[in-house]
């Protein structure tokens, strides 16, 4: 698979398949952030969730590299950067 194909696949997953399975990506990451914050007794942002999910995928790559991990990391990176874009427009 070429770089563009990986990125296209990640974009399709983030905007299509996963959104259908799990609902709106922003709401999902906000829900995860609330749960992790309550469990850890430490404030976690939705942006933090996306970064931590990339780290989870990186840990899995250490065991066995798969295309899916790289594609998922690209998807989480896109979500993470979209949070920085959203924050820029809030100020």
What is each residue range found by the language model?
Residues 1-40:
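Long, charged low-complexity segments
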Residues 16-17, 54, 82-84:
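Compositionally biased, intrinsically disordered low-complexity segments
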Residues 25-63:
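Short, contiguous, well-structured surface segments enriched in hydrophobic/aromatic residues
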Residues 64-83:
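Short, compact, well-ordered microdomains
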Residues 84-91:
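Conserved small/polar residues in nucleotide/adenosyl-binding loops
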């Amino acid at each position: 698979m070429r770089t563009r194909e990986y990125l296209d696949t990640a974009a399709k997953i983030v905007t299509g398949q996963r959104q259908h399975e799990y609902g709106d990506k922003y709401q999902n990451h906000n829900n995860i952030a609330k749960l992790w914050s309550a469990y850890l007794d430490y404030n976690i942002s939705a942006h933090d969730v996306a970064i931590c999910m990339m780290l989870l995928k990186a840990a899995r790559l250490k065991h066995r590299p798969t295309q899916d991990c790289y594609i998922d990391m690209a998807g989480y990176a896109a979500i993470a950067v979209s949070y920085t874009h959203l924050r820029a427009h809030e100020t």
